[in-house]
Amino acid sequence: MSDAATRAEETSEGHSSSAIGLMVGAVGVCYGDIGTSPLYTLKEVFIGGYGVQANHDGVLGVLSLIFWSLVWVVSIKYVIFVLRADNQGEGGVMALSALARRAAAPFGRLQTFVVVAGLIGAALFYGDSMITPAISVLSAVEGLEIAFDGLEHWTVPLALIVLIGLFLIQKHGTARIGILFGPVMVLWFGALAALGVYGVIQQPEVLQAMNPVWAVRFFGSHPGIGVAILGATVLALTGAEALYADMGHFGRKPIARAWFLLVLPALVLNYFGQGATILSNAEAARNPFYLLAPGWALLPMVALSTLATVIASQAVISGAFSLTRQAIQLGYVPRMTIQHTSSHEQGQIYIGGVNWALMVGVVLLVLGFESSASLAAAYGVAVTGTMLITTLLMGVVIWRLWKWPLWLGVPFFCVMLAVDSLFFAANLPKVIQGGAFPVIAGIVIFILMSTWKRGRQLLVERLDEGSLPLSVFISSMRVQPPHRVQGTAVFLTARTDAVPHALLHNLLHNQVLHEQVVLLTVVNEDSPRVPPDRRFEVEAYGDGFFRVILHFGFMEEPDIPAALRLCHLNELDFSPMRTTYFLSRETVIPSKRIGMARWREGLFAFLLKNANGNLRYFNLPLNRVIELGTQVEI
């Protein structure tokens, strides 16, 4: 064999092993949530009080609904289309919102709608982030009730031990054990498929459910509960949004390949196997997943299920951290301390406030609902709400960004909207039955995010009212030049045409200016990352005054000193011991001025007081920072 052929073969093998590695990684991170849905979906359908009979027509009808829901919602909508709506490789409701906002830029009202829709989607995701760990781990531990009599009272304590332990280790990171997530989940899906084949062999007639006629016939024979049952079958779709949210880690192709080659076949086989078990014994509907397993495999499946649900919960928690970082960068959430838990993976982060809030919510859910069957009632609202928001934002992308022809875009969008609206409507009655929790959590988080965003806008407007134009200030410095001291002073400001308040206060009290005065503005872009050649803009005004604008993406850490060192301008010296950073810290005073309701102004003042300041957020050196305070009425 020639050297060229050998190198080509090695390259091919390298690409092949890399592709397989990405697929395995995607299975471990992206598919944990939807992969653990078989633990509770069919159980909820048949014992959740919907009135579905565990007979031949009922089982085949439900299986057909689940199968075609997986095909349309996950395979067609998410894997084939939504994954293509990446924001420079990043996905998720925040990234999609930023993408749609750029596309809707010429239309003010549409842009406002996109912002509000993105905030609602993000708020519902946080509610989902609490429910997923609770219902997944509870459903896994409940398998012990099948294996051993009298363990019902131990289900909740065991689930709490697992969940609290999971949240406690977040601060230390999961880099070391994270490499096992993919192989464990591959083993999990292999077990799902094997159990499914075991069940289908006993009742091959369940394969008839692939015919959509059974789903249509089910609606026809159950006119009273046909739509309501969608509220239970949607549990099979939980985690579909995670495929899109985690796209930045693996890319579209590995996620799509993992779905079609492993995850979808394993899920379909397992659901059909559970259906076969119910056809053989209607009593198996009380927990068809575990009763599908042979007796000798029950305890191993409980152990594997617990591992799989922990991995699924970890993926959701990590997703909440990532979403929070994006929201902070886009200006929707107060600044928090972000801790990196891995020196190799930039995306592995820890946000203490989010972690403890999620833990409290999860513990309250487990204590309040006590079983996966009870908790299933609260699950669908957040899931279908987020799916509906994604469809609405996708409509903007299809129209304004992809510019599909109307004859193609309108029918496709209408079908997506109709399906998601049907699922969402089917879950609305759950608000009364226990589904109020994610709705309340979503409302609270939406109020917090919208109040912070609006409060920041009002704060900038109030500061602008008393601002001095930069050109006037520089002209006055030429007429009456103050004493200049050595070094570089960097003043952070949101305005590019006005004098920062910190500069005016410093000049008023100290009567001096540095040799070099830099007015620095940080701009957070709607894209995930900014290339080095677009990182900064520099403008020299003369007399030692400079304007610098730094650009950061919503997936980047805004390190100002590191960015300024790349500012190649001979006149500027940003050496650490010659540079002083001046910050302005505002204290907000609620007033009767037109802006927000007084209670929202008070809430914003509280959030601003407890938010991390610019010092930590921008990685400024502690011994080179001077903060100057000012009071502002909003």
Curated annotation (Swiss-Prot):
GO terms for cellular component: plasma membrane. This is Probable potassium transport system protein Kup. It holds the Pfam family K_trans. HAMAP family: Kup. The chain crosses the membrane at residues 19-39, 62-82, 113-133, 150-170, 177-197, 225-245, 259-279, 291-311, 349-369, 379-399, 406-426, 431-451. Disulfide bonds: none annotated. GO terms for molecular function: potassium ion transmembrane transporter activity; symporter activity. Keywords: Cell inner membrane, Cell membrane, Ion transport, Membrane, Potassium, Potassium transport, Symport, Transmembrane, Transmembrane helix, Transport. It comes from Pseudomonas aeruginosa (strain UCBPP-PA14). Coiled coil: none annotated. It is a multi-pass membrane protein. InterPro entries: K+_transporter (IPR003855), K_trans_C (IPR053952), K_trans_N (IPR053951), Kup (IPR023051). The keyword Cell division does not apply. PANTHER family: LOW AFFINITY POTASSIUM TRANSPORT SYSTEM PROTEIN KUP, OSMOTIC STRESS POTASSIUM TRANSPORTER. Belongs to the HAK/KUP transporter (TC 2.A.72) family. It is found in: Cell inner membrane. It comes from the Bacteria. It catalyses: K(+)(in) + H(+)(in) = K(+)(out) + H(+)(out). Transport of potassium into the cell. Likely operates as a K(+):H(+) symporter.
